Amino acid sequence: MRLPLPSDLPATLQPLVTRNQQFISDAVAGHPELDLQAWSPLHRQQFDQVAAASEFVLSLAQREPAMLFALLASGELERRYAPGELRGQIAATAQAAQSEDELARNLRRARNRQQLRIIWRDITRQAELGETCRDLSDLADAAIDEAYQWLYPRHCQQFGTPIGNRSGQPQHMVVLGMGKLGAVELNLSSDIDLIFGFPEGGETEGVKRSLDNQEFFTRLGQRLIKALDPVTVDGFVFRVDMRLRPYGSAGALVLSFNALEQYYQDQGRDWERYAMIKARVVAGDQAAGAQLQEMLRPFVYRRYLDFSAIEALRTMKQLIQQEVRRKGMAENIKLGAGGIREVEFIAQAFQLIHGGRDLSLQQRPLLKVLATLEGQGYLPPAVVAELREGYEFLRYTEHAIQAIADRQTQMLPEGETDQARVAYVLGFADWQSFHDQLMYWRGRIDWHFRQVIADPDDEDGEGELVVGGEWSPLWEQAQDEEAAGRQLQEAGFKQPAEALRRLAGLRSSPQLRSMQRIGRERLDAFIPRLLAQAVEHDNPDLVLERVLPLVEAVARRSAYLVLLTENPGALRRLLTLCAASPWIAEQIALYPLLLDELLNEGRLFSPPLAPELASELRERLTRIPEDDLEQQMEALRHFKLAHSLRVAASEISGNLPLMKVSDYLTWLAEAILDQVLALAWRQTVARHGQPKRSDGSLCDPGFIIIGYGKMGGLELGHGSDLDLVFIHDGDPQAETDGAKPIDSAQFFTRLGQRIIHLLTTQTNSGQLYDVDMRLRPSGASGLLVSSLGAFERYQQNEAWTWEHQALVRARVLVGCKQVGAAFEGVRAKVLGQARDLEKLRGEVSEMRAKMRDNLGTKATAAGTAANAFDAGVPFDIKQDAGGIVDIEFMVQYAALAWSHDHPAILRWTDNIRILEELEQANLMPASDAVLLREVYKAFRSASHRQALQKEAGVIDAAQFADERREVRRIWGELGLS
C-alpha cells in the first residue's frame, strides 16, 4: 500500500515548528560553515515535517548538525541507495578504526547517520515500506559483518587461528540473523536476534597457549556483541538479543554445527521451528552458513504434512495473549489482537504445515510468502489482499511510533502530541480517524487469524461444542457396552456390535499401544469427530469399516490426525470418498500424504488440463536441485498420487464423465513421462555425452516414447500399466561426445533402462507405473530401444498381424518432434498397406479366439455358451464375447482393412474417434457405429466402477445382455468368426 503524503501539520504540532526551527538555528550558530539560508524551500518543509514527527531526528540534528547538512548536500535524502552502497559506507567506517573503542564509536556514528536518513525518507514518503525495511536490514548486516571482519584477525593475533579437527582448515564463525533481521524486515528501532555457530571443534594454532575453538569463538562473540550493543555517548548500533540460541540465556554463547544439529534434532521445540523459518546468514562464513542451514532444514520443514504446527502456534498465541492481558498491552500493535504477529502466524502456519513438500513456501519475507499462498491456492486473493494491506498499515504505524524517540515499542502512544505525530505520519487529520482505520485493519486480521489458527474446540455462539463431544464417552469406554451399542444403533449403525468390535480392535492395536502421550491425546480428540461425521452418512458401518484401517495406518504420525481434527471439511471429504471407493481408502492409507489434497475442495474436484498439469510438474521439479535424484523421484510420485486422487474424486462426485477421466489420467502419464525422459536424458548425457545422428549432428534427444494399448488409445484407468516402445534415430556406430564415450546404441539402451528405473522403482511413495515393453520389435527377446529404421524393417517384414493391430493404437507420447513425425509416417505406411481381407479376417479371428480361450470365463466358454446371458453367471467385461476386446478387435480390423483407401482412419488411435471416422466414410452403418461407441463407453464405465471398488472387471451376465448380442451381431456381419 502507499500512504498519502503528509499534509499540513495539525494544530497540536504547529507549536513544534517554531521550537524546532529555533533549535536548529541555535545548533548551527557555532558552525559558520553551515548555512541554513542555503536550504531549499523543499528542505525546510521536509525538516519541519520530520522534526515535528521525530524527537530523535531533532535531537540528532541538534547534536550533529553537520551530519544533517552533509546528507542534504550529498542528495542522499532524495534517492534510494544503489545495491552495495550502504555496505560500502559501513565498511569504510569500520576499516578506518584503529582500536575497538574507535570501531564502536565509528559504527554508532554511522548508524545514527543512516537512521536519520531512513526516518527522513520514511516520514516524507520518499521511501516505501520495503525500502525502509531493506535499508535497516542492510545496515544491520553490514554493521555485524564489518565488525566481525575487523575483530576476527585481531582475535586470531591474540589467541591463534582456530583450526578444524576434521578438515584441518581455519574456522570462521557463522552468524545467523533471526526474526525480522533474517527476513529483511527490520523496523526503525529493532533489536537483532542472533545465533552464533562454528563448523568444527578443534584448537587454535600459532600462539604459545592455544584455545579450544569453543572458547575462541565464545570470546569473539562477546567482543562482537560489545561492539554493537552497549549504549555509549554516541548511542548504540543495535540491541543484540541472543536468547533464541539453544537453551536460551543458560546455553553456550556459541555452538559447533554438530552441537546445533544435535540440539534441534533431539530437543528443538515448536517455537524454535517457527523462529528458524526466517534464519539467514548475516555475517561470517557464508558458505559454511549455507551448510548449517541445510543441516537444520529437516528440523524446520517436515517432509510430511505437519498440522501439529497449528497447535504449537495456537499455544504460542495463548501465551502471548496471557502476557498482553497481564501487562495491559491490548494497544500493542505487534502482540495484541489483530496485530503484526497474527499476520506472521498465518503465513508461518502454512509454511510449517506445507513447506516440507512445497518448496515455494521455504522463503523468509512475509509479503513474498503471502504472494505464494495466493499463487499456490492456499488462500483466496481477497484474503491475501486484506492481510497484505493490513500488515503494511501496521508496519507503517510501527515505524511512526518508533521514529518519535528511537525506542523499541509497538504500544500506541497515550499523549496527545505523540498521537498527533502518528496520525500525521500515517496521513490522517486527527487521531480518531487514524484509530478507526487501525481498528478496522486489526479486526480484519484477527478474523482471518481465527479462521486459520482457531481451535476447533472453541465454543460457538450458543456455548455448545461444535462436534464430537457426545461420542467421547463411547471412545473412552466411560459407558458400558450395552449403552454404547444403543447409542450407535440410535445414530444409524446397522451392526453396532461390529462397530464396537472395530473400535476395540483399533484401541488395542500394536500401533496405538506404542503411541506417545501426545499422539494418544490427538487420537482421543479425533475419534469422536470421526464418529460424529460417520453417522451423517447413509451407511456409517461401511464408513467405519473403510476409515479405521486408515486411522490405524497413520496413527503413529499423529500430525495427520491433527490435520483432520483441524479441518472438519477435509474429514467430511475423506469419509465421503472412502464410503464411495475402497480403492481410494486404500490409497490414502498407503500414502497418507494424500490427505493434503482433501484440504482444498475446489482443487480436489477440479483436476487441471494437460498444459496446466505439465506446467505444475515442471515448476515443482525446478525447485529441486538437479543432483537430488531422491527428491525428484519423490516429487514425481507425490504428483502422480495427488492428481490420481483428484481424478478419482472428480469421477465419484460426477464432475468428470468417463471419457474425461481417461483423458486426465493419460495427460497425467504424459506429463510424468516428459519429465522422466528429461531427467534420464540429463543423467545419461552427464555420464557419457550426447549421441550423434548419421549426419554428424547431435541428438537432442533424437528419442521418442511410443504409447500402445490404453496409453496410446487415451483410455488409461486407475492402476493401468503403461505399454511403451522406445525409438531413436541415432547412428548406432557413432560414439557419444562425453568423457566416457559409448556408441549410440548403448547410449539409448542405457537411456531406456534409466527411464524404466525412474518409472518402476519402489520408494516410500510407491512406484510411478508398471511398464510393459513386450510390444517392442521381437517382444521380450528384442532390443530395448530400436532405431527408427530397424523398427520400420521389422514392421514391414517380420511383424505378425496382431502386432499391426497393436500399432493401430500406437501414439507418440513425448520426445523429439522430428523423430515423432518420422514415426507417424512409418505407422501410416505400415498400417495403410493393401491387405488380403479374407486372410486378415482369419488371422484377427484366430487371435481373438486364443485370447477368449485363455482369458475368458470358463463357465460360459468365454461368453459363447448357451448360459452366457443367465442371471448369476459371471461376465468378464473385457475378455468375454461381446465385450470390450471384441469391439477393439473390430476397430483394429477395420483400420487394417480399409485405411489403404481411407487413410483418414489412421489419424486417430482411440476407438471412439476411429468409429466416428468409419461412420463418416460410410464403411460402417451409422447405427452400428453409434451402438459400438455407446456400448464401449458403457463397458469402460463399468470397468472403472469395478476398479474403484477394488473388484475385478466381472459382473452379472444378465447385465448388458442386449448390448453384447448386438456386438456379436456386428462381429459376424464383418465376417469375423
From Swiss-Prot:
Domain of life of the organism in this record? Bacteria
**Named cofactor requirement(s):** Mg(2+)
All disulfide bonds of the chain are none
Q: Which UniProt keywords apply?
A: ATP-binding, Magnesium, Multifunctional enzyme, Nucleotide-binding, Nucleotidyltransferase, Transferase
One of the entry's Gene Ontology molecular-function terms is: [glutamate-ammonia-ligase] adenylyltransferase activity
Task: Give the residue ranges for region: Adenylyl removase.
Answer: 1-457
UniProt entry tagged with the keyword Transferase = yes
Region of interest (Adenylyl transferase), ranges: 468-977
Q: What is its EC number?
A: 2.7.7.89, 2.7.7.42
What is this protein's function? Answer: Involved in the regulation of glutamine synthetase GlnA, a key enzyme in the process to assimilate ammonia. When cellular nitrogen levels are high, the C-terminal adenylyl transferase (AT) inactivates GlnA by covalent transfer of an adenylyl group from ATP to specific tyrosine residue of GlnA, thus reducing its activity. Conversely, when nitrogen levels are low, the N-terminal adenylyl removase (AR) activates GlnA by removing the adenylyl group by phosphorolysis, increasing its activity.
Q: Which family does it belong to?
A: Belongs to the GlnE family.
| Protein name per its UniProtKB record | Bifunctional glutamine synthetase adenylyltransferase/adenylyl-removing enzyme
- Native source organism of the sequence: Pseudomonas putida (strain ATCC 47054 / DSM 6125 / CFBP 8728 / NCIMB 11950 / KT2440)
> Which gene is the coding source of this polypeptide chain?
glnE
